[in-house]
């Protein structure tokens, strides 16, 4: 699984590097952030107790763009509420708001979304569902093609959250991801 994530991030970095024009390098602060879903059983670690710290951390590190995992719609809304960020991505359960998101959150004054989409890691990637030997739940990839407003450079960002146990699901998800890229 680590190899898959390495290839995914390598592809992102190569995409950014290849989009450089006239050897003018543009830098972005990018990250991946597993928000941890909001569940009442978390008690004092519930989202209500964590959201201010999460927001502080995001703004402290001044991420330009980052992918999230396990965030419910209301958690994503809490992050973008101050107005400096926007997001793309859908809930994994219905393709709208239900279920966890693998959202891409970005500074809305720095990037334009030129194209975007979502697909599920299953035998039917356009329909919400889980595939192969996935043990838990639907898994999704959210992606977007961005344009950096300051440099004019374009790049793609793919954000994933694989099944944590199904080895065949992980392998097939990687193959599907590479096909989509």
Residues of each region from the PLM?
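Short, solvent-exposed loop/turn segments at secondary-structure boundaries
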Residues: 42-46, 131-132, 167-171
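Generic structural signal for well-ordered alpha-helical scaffold segments
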Residues: 55, 145, 178-181
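N-terminal, active-site-proximal structural segment of metallo-dependent hydrolase catalytic domains
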Residues: 18-83, 93-100, 174-175
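Bacterial Sec-dependent N-terminal signal peptides
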Residues: 1-26
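Active-site-flanking beta-strand signature of metal-NTP-handling nucleotidyl enzymes
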Residues: 14, 31, 158
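Structured beta-strand-rich core segments of catalytic domains in phosphoester-bond hydrolases
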Residues: 65-158, 162
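Short strand-loop junctions, especially beta-strand C-caps/beta-turns
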Residues: 36-40, 160-165
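A long, amphipathic alpha-helix that forms part
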Residues: 167-181
């Amino acid at each position: 699984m680590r190899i898959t994530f390495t290839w995914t991030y390598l592809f992102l970095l190569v995409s950014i590097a290849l989009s450089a024009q006239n050897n003018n390098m543009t830098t972005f602060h990018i990250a991946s952030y597993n928000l941890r879903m909001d569940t009442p059983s978390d008690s004092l670690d519930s989202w209500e107790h964590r959201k201010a710290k999460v927001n502080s951390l995001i703004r402290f590190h001044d991420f330009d763009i980052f992918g999230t995992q396990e965030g419910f719609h209301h958690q994503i809304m809490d992050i973008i509420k101050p107005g400096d960020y926007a997001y793309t991505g859908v809930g994994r359960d219905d393709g709208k708001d239900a279920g966890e998101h693998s959202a891409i959150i970005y500074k809305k004054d720095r990037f334009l979304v030129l194209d975007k989409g979502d697909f599920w890691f299953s035998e039917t990637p356009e329909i919400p569902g889980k595939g192969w030997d996935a043990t838990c739940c639907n898994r999704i990839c959210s992606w977007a093609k961005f344009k950096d407003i300051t440099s004019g450079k374009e790049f793609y960002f793919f954000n994933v959250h694989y099944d944590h146990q199904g080895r065949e699901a992980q392998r097939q998800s990687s193959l599907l991801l590479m096909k989509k890229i």
